[in-house]
């Protein structure tokens, strides 16, 4: 199953591991389908490690998002985003050694700690962390994340010869304003310094086994 992330720096063609991690894949595809990722930034980056995006609270999500049940209405999406299962937890789907952070271009969920198992988004949590809408893509193998984050896909175009070209390298080398914690400040119109905007413009779904 595949999608294309149309980014500010070109198209990332992504294969999803729907059979191995069905809940994670369904969550990602549903958020893609309703436009939740449209016009959202990549808000963290560490060249040589990873780039992170998918915070649906940061983008101008369309009104269609509130038709995705049990998703919250657009104006009630919590800071950091949430999964389609809200207020229930989207638990980790760890599969070792089959799915690991063992290469460049691995797509994985950015988890958050569970502080209160009765809180919205954490209800029914089975582990110390849960997933929401945020994800990251590795720039290199990151074995220290194995067992901690859910791998659910991989980027297919990783070289200049691949269809679409090596877009991940363009993102990694973009001229950005970044703080010590890797947080990206998107440039303002007319701002000096030549900084680039970086994010997801839209998503095309090529196959969705969960569509009804």
From Swiss-Prot:
Cite a single Pfam family from the UniProt record. Answer: Pro_isomerase
Q: What is its EC number?
A: 5.2.1.8
Where, by residue number, does the polypeptide cross the bilayer? Answer: none
User: GO molecular function terms here?
Assistant: peptidyl-prolyl cis-trans isomerase activity
Q: Please provide, in alphabetical order, the Gene Ontology terms of the cellular component aspect for this entry.
A: catalytic step 2 spliceosome
Keyword flag Isomerase: yes
Protein name from the UniProt record: Peptidyl-prolyl cis-trans isomerase-like 3
The species this protein was found in: Aspergillus fumigatus (strain ATCC MYA-4609 / CBS 101355 / FGSC A1100 / Af293) (Neosartorya fumigata)
Gene, per the UniProt record:
cyp10
